[in-house]
Design a protein with these regions (language model features):
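Non-transmembrane accessory domains of multi-pass membrane transporters/channels
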Residues: 133-204, 209-210
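Membrane-interacting alpha-helical segments
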Residues: 12-23, 76, 80, 168, ...
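Generic structural signal for hydrophobic core residues of well-folded globular domains
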Residues: 26, 69, 125-128, 175-178, ...
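Cytosolic juxtamembrane amphipathic/interface segments immediately preceding
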Residues: 29-47
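Soluble C-terminal extramembrane regulatory/interaction domains of multi-pass membrane proteins
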Residues: 142, 146, 167, 189-192, ...
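Juxtamembrane/interfacial segments around transmembrane helices
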Residues: 31-37, 95-112, 154-164
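Pore domain of cation channels
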Residues: 48-134, 209
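Membrane-interface amphipathic/juxtamembrane segments adjacent to transmembrane helices
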Residues: 2-30, 132-146
Length: 348
């Protein structure tokens, strides 16, 4: 069993960033987001293979140095013997007893790297499936790309309650799994969803928006769970944006901020807290009215509270969406380099 641990500094971060940065260079020459998404699907597999190649190369260099110091072989001969032993080809004969021990060690390390790599791939696949399965089910009510108000509207239409689809406990588990998986394996963030209209950053943002909006309008039955859900999402986005670095924000501190906003003791600035323009907000209001989620006056009065809660996580969500080149959807279009989902109809 391979059990990796989170780290702020490591080869995985460097390789993933370099590969993804290089693959982003030709995106401007691609006309549609679907083409861009298909191209960026190469980033994660290339990063994984590059990590394997680099680790094997480092072991070969280390064994070559040992062999060179123990024998009269040249650098080229020592390097060839190290490469043959680490890759278990067995095409060279040890020169002396010490070089034979070094060759055996190199062969063992080569097998260990391959075994660990196979376990690593299994772990990546399991984490990817766990992340995508809930998102696929979530898309049935959130739409693709996911949108917070759509969750409340469809839930109201299907179940007669706008919060029926907001399973805060399930989403808190999902967010913690996403955070743990991507802290342990940074390349997991770059594995893209099978559908180009779906992305984990947009799904997380829409779920937080739906929970924050429902809480602002007083629709949630279990306010404590909703507050914990928003706090967990806020911290998850902050940690992933900082690539696992330690942050000062704690669960209780974030929960307290949300609680103060809902209770009206946080000194809300209606103008400064707004992160959604009037056109996008009115579109959501019309949708919620159409499905009888709430009266227009109740929705409008909840806007300052909702915007203040949203300000806790929106910057980190947008930064991650921009960095990962996520699909642009309603209320998630603040990052550059994406297109609106409606243009996907014309994609080839």
């Amino acid at each position: 069993m391979v059990v990796p641990r989170a780290t702020r500094i490591g080869l995985a971060h460097v390789v993933t960033r370099v590969v993804f940065g290089l693959l982003r260079l030709p995106l401007r020459m691609m006309r549609t987001y679907r083409t861009q998404d298909r191209w960026l699907r190469l980033a994660a597999p290339i990063s994984v293979l590059a990590q394997l190649a680099i680790f094997v190369a480092l072991i070969i260099c280390g064994v070559a140095l040992i062999v060179f110091g123990q024998t009269n072989l040249t650098w080229k001969q020592a390097g060839w013997q190290a490469a043959a032993t680490v890759t278990t080809l067995g095409t060279t004969e040890p020169v002396n007893w010490s070089s034979a021990m070094s060759s055996a060690l190199g062969a063992f390390l080569g097998l260990v790297v391959i075994a660990v790599f196979m376990g690593y791939l299994v772990g990546l696949y399991s984490a990817f499936v766990a992340r995508e399965s809930l998102m696929a089910r979530f898309a049935q009510v959130a739409g693709e790309p996911a949108w917070g108000p759509m969750i409340l509207a469809r839930s109201q239409a299907l179940a007669g309650s706008p919060i029926e689809a907001l399973d805060c406990a399930e989403w808190m588990t999902w967010m913690t799994d996403v955070r743990l998986g991507q802290q342990a394996s940074p390349v997991l963030a770059h594995f893209r969803s099978p559908d180009p209209t779906r992305h984990w950053t947009v799904s997380m943002l829409s779920m937080l928006d739906a929970t924050a909006l429902a809480s602002s309008m007083g629709l949630v039955a279990d306010r404590a769970s909703a507050i914990r859900c928003v706090a967990e999402g806020t911290i998850t986005l902050a940690v992933l944006r900082r690539r696992g670095a330690a942050i000062e924000t704690t669960n209780w501190r974030t929960e307290r901020m949300v609680l103060d906003i809902l209770d009206g003791s946080a000194g809300i600035d209606p103008e400064g807290a707004r992160s959604i323009d009037d056109a996008d907000w009115n579109m959501a209001v019309e949708l919620l009215q159409q499905f009888d989620v709430a009266k227009r006056s109740d929705i409008e009065s909840a806007r300052p509270v909702f915007s203040a809660i949203r300000s806790l996580y929106i910057d980190d969500a947008m930064e991650l969406a921009a960095e990962l080149h996520a699909i642009k959807g309603p209320w998630s279009g603040g990052h550059s380099g994406s297109v609106d989902a409606t243009s996907l109809d014309d994609c080839g």
